[in-house]
Amino acid sequence: MKVKFKGKEVTLEGTEIKVGDTFPDFVAVNSSLEPVMLKNTNRVRVFLAVPSVDTPVCDLEVKTFNARASEIDGVSIYTISMDLPFAQSRWCGAEGIKNVTTLSDYRDRAFGKNTGTYIKELGLLARAVFVVDSSNKVTYANYLEEVSGYPNYDEVLQAAQAAK
């Protein structure tokens, strides 16, 4: 899998996730610094891997999914980055984010390494989107070729709706 960050090719560590795969286990950290595992939630989930919520591209991506979350009622949306939970919480509060849950991968990098989104050179996550159904099967996986690009919002929302 080849991914670029601002035009320069970077190395992704971990295993690339494909449609049909079982979504891997991981532990992330919530805004209260508590560990969170999401494997057996018995609902459809959208995972947005982003480098940092506090950058213009990530900011717009999360705000867009937050605004459009009602289009996929009953689906949980998670944004995961290497940001510290305090920074994520501050940003969400300042931006009024209520329909997307932020999680941090700073502690163990388990999400990044288990989904093949961890950028070795930068210690950040590559931009990727995964839709996971209630039986923990991946129904949509997209690693953006350029980390500074935007996902196809309509395509992701359609995939999430279809996974219900």
Swiss-Prot record:
Matches recorded under CDD domains: PRX_Atyp2cys
UniProt keyword Disulfide bond present: yes
Additional note from the record: The active site is a conserved redox-active cysteine residue, the peroxidatic cysteine (C(P)), which makes the nucleophilic attack on the peroxide substrate. The peroxide oxidizes the C(P)-SH to cysteine sulfenic acid (C(P)-SOH), which then reacts with another cysteine residue, the resolving cysteine (C(R)), to form a disulfide bridge. The disulfide is subsequently reduced by an appropriate electron donor to complete the catalytic cycle. In this atypical 2-Cys peroxiredoxin, C(R) is present in the same subunit to form an intramolecular disulfide.
Family note: Belongs to the peroxiredoxin family. Tpx subfamily.
EC class (word): oxidoreductase
Xref: InterPro entries: Redoxin, Thioredoxin-like_sf, Thioredoxin_domain, TPX, Tpx_CS, Tpx_Peroxidase_subfamily
Pfam families xrefs: Redoxin
Disulfide pattern: C58-C92
Molecular function (Gene Ontology), one example: thioredoxin peroxidase activity
Catalytic activity: a hydroperoxide + [thioredoxin]-dithiol = an alcohol + [thioredoxin]-disulfide + H2O
UniProt-recorded name of the protein: Thiol peroxidase
Gene3D superfamilies membership: Glutaredoxin
Enzyme Commission (EC) number: 1.11.1.24
Statement: the UniProt record of this protein carries the keyword Ion transport: no
Superkingdom of this protein's organism: Bacteria
Described purpose of this protein according to its UniProt entry: Thiol-specific peroxidase that catalyzes the reduction of hydrogen peroxide and organic hydroperoxides to water and alcohols, respectively. Plays a role in cell protection against oxidative stress by detoxifying peroxides.
Stored PROSITE patterns: THIOREDOXIN_2 (PS51352), TPX (PS01265)
Keywords, sorted A to Z: Antioxidant, Disulfide bond, Oxidoreductase, Peroxidase, Redox-active center
Residues annotated as the enzyme's active site: C58 (cysteine sulfenic acid (-soh) intermediate)
